[in-house]
Amino acid sequence: MPHGQPCGACDGSCRMAQRGTPSTSPLIPSLTPSPPAGDPSPRSSQRIDAVRVPARLPGGSDHPEYGMPLSPRALRPYLARGPGAFCAPPWRPDVNRLAGDVNRLFRGISTSSIHVTEDSRTLRRALLDFYAMGYTHTRPTLECWQSLLQLLPEQSFPLRATLRALNSEDRYEQRFLEPPSDPPNTLFGEECDVSGDESPSEEEEEDEASGESSVSEFSPEEETASSEYDSFSDVGEDDSSCTGKWSSSESESDSESDAPTNNHHPTTRASAAKKRRKRQPPKGERPTKSARR
């Protein structure tokens, strides 16, 4: 029986006035006696507080969020196939279903993404944005829904029907969801803070490249100084053990003072070298065979 008609449980006084019509109907009078003047009925005041403006306006007006009402015949083909077949009225939040769906998305990111941490943050941010829109009463338009979920107008039929059914409810009481009672066995979204899978962004790569190019290279003077430093560091090492000869004339002069004195063998290597210098012929003359030897 239509709402507002008299029946065993309704006396007709709770009927809702149509838009643009007077609050009382002269065709269907009230079946209950009117209360005395100055004695308002507490029952009627409570009923007025519970009245909520329906989301579907009278006459099936076009709603900015989910459009015109859809017939079951037009909706049925899109509930079983296509990208839009992810919801159907009636719809209620299910924390176990939500945990499983989010975990499947994390699995796809962890197995195929090259930026696991960055993409995981993106998914978490998207979930929070949709919650924040509902909490702040920010309702997307139909075109905004289609753009966010990347659906064609025909593919959004199930979504439109589901949104209309949700908004046609009288009221929702605030409640808090507990953690899922049946969580997934493997949580693909769990990762440590230092996972090593974050690749540097383009800005970081440019900074590193500029830092490498700005490193000063050794100049020829610095290389010469470093080579001289290396040669000085090796002076203290005696190379006579490996060559069997004195390394320079300075070492010969040093060895002359350090050479052991022997009365029977006064000739040293230093004196022999001096004798060889005296035997050298003047410039321009060829040395004799004995001098060559």
From Swiss-Prot:
It comes from Equine herpesvirus 1 (strain Kentucky A). Belongs to the herpesviridae ICP22 family. Residues 282-293 have a biased composition (Basic and acidic residues). GO terms for biological process: regulation of gene expression. It holds the Pfam family Herpes_IE68. GO terms for cellular component: host cell nucleus. Keywords: Early protein. This is Transcriptional regulator ICP22 homolog. Residues 190-210 have a biased composition (Acidic residues). One of its GO terms (molecular function) is identical protein binding. Residues 21-31 have a biased composition (Low complexity). Residues 1-49, 175-293 are annotated as: Disordered. Residues 272-281 have a biased composition (Basic residues). It comes from the Viruses.
